[in-house]
Amino acid sequence: MFPAMLNVGLGLRRGLLPELLAMEAGAVDFLECAPENWIAVGGAYGKGLAQLAERFAVTCHGLSLSLGGSAPLDRHFLEQTRQFLDRYQVRLYSEHLSYCSDDGHLYDLMPIPFTDEAVRHVAARIRQAQEQLERRIAVENISYYAAPYQAMSELDFIQAVLEEADCDLLLDVNNVYVNACNHGYDAQQFLAGLPQARVAGMHVAGHYDEAPDLKVDTHGAAVKEDVWALYASACARFGVQPTVLERDFNYPPLAELLAETARMRAVQCAAGGQADE
């Protein structure tokens, strides 16, 4: 029986699979995977996913739907994703508010111009994806370094997309911090401007300090203190939401990752959340 509340999660990465398979039930509430990396996987990896899904709830965070792209949405991939989400009874599916294809795959998450036209374009694609997937999507605020054309602020753009598409938000707290440092806005004010009812989950991760005014979202290090503080503010404003610790490389021993998820749970409890028994 999975916990009724999915409070604390860890990103499912193939490099962590042996340790995750040996992890005690209850160490985290759920695991988050990218469906693209697992849909067609068999062998030891496929067996490992099936074993983990019997012990932990699964959520999904997509990588390649390219909601902001110009090419038509890949309906075959959407159908594969829908079947994957149904098979593993996925409660939360999210995708990046970005594009990653332009006459071919770009292998990166590119920011969308902050314009009214882009709002209408991406919102229509989100609605189409939600219809085919037969569930709501939460879109994630991304980190970006070269700002796209901006007829409105990032905050106004996100607000408009959420309203026009009638979708949810996966709030990446580290990305808010990174963008605030890099583009000179106040992270707390950014959180205060987001619609509370739309936040369906959160991410926390580590970043690299290139300079005081240049942070790089790497997912390759421990979560920094400023991000923990911002996460506490996010929990205070939006309540306890399913939160994933993302770590994509430079994997430490699993015990170190679980120490971070334990801290995540402590922050949630301080904000009024309750740990599942």
UniProtKB/Swiss-Prot annotation:
SUPFAM superfamilies: Xylose isomerase-like (SSF51658). Belongs to the UPF0276 family. This is UPF0276 protein PP_2398.
